[in-house]
Amino acid sequence: MPQKFATKPLLFLLIVTFLTSCSMFTPKDNNMKWTAQYNFMDLYNQKVYEGYFNAGAAIEVNGIAIINSHTILLGAEKDLRAFDPEILEKQAVLFVSTDKGKTYKEIPLEGNYFDSFYKTEDYCIIETSGEHRFIYLFNNKTLKAEKIDECDNDLSIWYGIFDGRYIMYSNGKNEYVMDISNRSKMYEKPKAIKDIPTYPINQNGDLIYMKNNDLYIYNVISQQEKLYKKLKNKYDYFLPIDEADSPLTLQQVKNEDDEEKYEEKIYNLDEELLYVINKDNRRKHYRYNNFICDYSALGTSPEIRFSYDYGKNWKTHHVKGFSILQSTFGFYKDEFLVTEGIFFRGNSPESGGRIMVGEFQK
């Protein structure tokens, strides 16, 4: 009998020891702080698809642009059928938050599909499509969207790299630099650099490009070319770091056609090595200076890894309570990210999609 009672404290002690040891090995997830989770029900105040689903089910976010530390833009497609079963089409929409993701307002756009953002400090170029393509200029200060062009879907009209005032523009025959503040002012790209990738910079008509392995600037207004920087090393490409609106970099590439042996070295314009890209880190990485975020491990148990020293040391955040099923992310410097989280709570009002804001904790 005494032995029978002795086993209970022993069993209890073993359980406590086990749970304590487990907690010691449970990853600590205080390296990110989720500061906002926006529910589209707050905007629409109704369920959709005949009352069966949260309003977020009708919104497909295809692009995220973060303008500054508090202004977030979501480019999306709104399924109008969800609100009215007789309207069988989608509408391109822009959602704007000025309080770091706590609330949003909707700006309807022409077209059925949201295609792209091109972000600068003062303006964004937005493209949507449907029966036609629509080009918008979004003012980051007034938060107003102005349609500046409507064209056919044959892609003969093309808007490209943008420095906040001047933008690369093609009509299918010739390539120009357009002054977005006065769109009647267009400067044709010179034949001497016609086949060289060029990028507007400085908001004064300057184009920067790599020629004969050196960097040059040509001003489309003065029509003068000057040597910008004589490079010490040889480079294969002069391109934006990741997306079209990211910083320009010098790139050296090895084994470009071999996925296993592929290697890409990224340098800034001072020829300082930033990082190396290979098969292991080629996709779903965001970079800002020495900061890297790996958001490739998505799904029902997503993980977000980030590093503040070019990937030498990593922190891993194990996302709890919601899933991340799409790779649509937006980042603000090395401070926070925005993405869509899915909460599975059955018929509870807590179920459905939310626009999440996660702050990185250094």
Indicate residue ranges for each PLM-predicted region:
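C-terminal motif of bacterial Sec signal peptides marking the signal peptidase cleavage site
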Residues: T20-S21
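Beta-strand-rich domains and repeat architectures in extracellular enzymes and scaffolds
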Residues: Y52-D84, E89
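Blade-level signature of beta-propeller repeat domains, shared across WD40, Kelch, NHL, RCC1
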Residues: Q326-K362
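A short loop-to-beta-strand structural motif that recurs across blades of beta-propeller domains
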Residues: A92-V96, F134-Y136, N174-Y176, D214-Y216, ...
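Conserved Ser/Thr-centered positions that define the repeating blades of beta-propeller domains
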Residues: S97-T98, I161, S307-Y308, G358
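Repeated scaffold domains used in trafficking and secretory/extracellular systems
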Residues: A58-A65, G111-E121, N153-G164, A192-N204, ...
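A short helix->beta-strand "capping" segment at the edge of beta-propeller domains
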Residues: P27-A58
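Short glycine/acidic-enriched loop and turn motifs that connect beta-strands
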Residues: K78-D84, S129-H132, K254-D258, L298-T300, ...
